[in-house]
């Protein structure tokens, strides 16, 4: 999975924690997006 697709899956910062576990770099991308 790419970081781009991870960003789409993350949604708002308040919701990404409830999504399917991400790789550390993907989690960081979510927080920054």
Swiss-Prot record:
Any GO MF annotation of the entry: RNA-directed RNA polymerase activity
Keywords for the protein's UniProt record, in alphabetical order: Nucleotidyltransferase, RNA-directed RNA polymerase, Transferase
Coiled coil: none
Enzyme class: transferase
EC number, as in UniProt: 2.7.7.48
Catalytic activity: RNA(n) + a ribonucleoside 5'-triphosphate = RNA(n+1) + diphosphate
Stated role: This enzyme is part of the viral RNA-dependent RNA polymerase complex.
Quaternary assembly: The polymerase complex is composed of four chains, the three other proteins of the complex (alpha, gamma, and delta chains) are supplied by the host cell.
Name of this protein: RNA-directed RNA polymerase beta chain
């Amino acid at each position: 999975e790419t970081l781009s697709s991870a960003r789409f899956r993350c949604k708002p910062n308040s919701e990404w924690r409830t999504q399917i576990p991400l790789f550390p770099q993907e989690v960081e991308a979510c927080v920054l997006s």
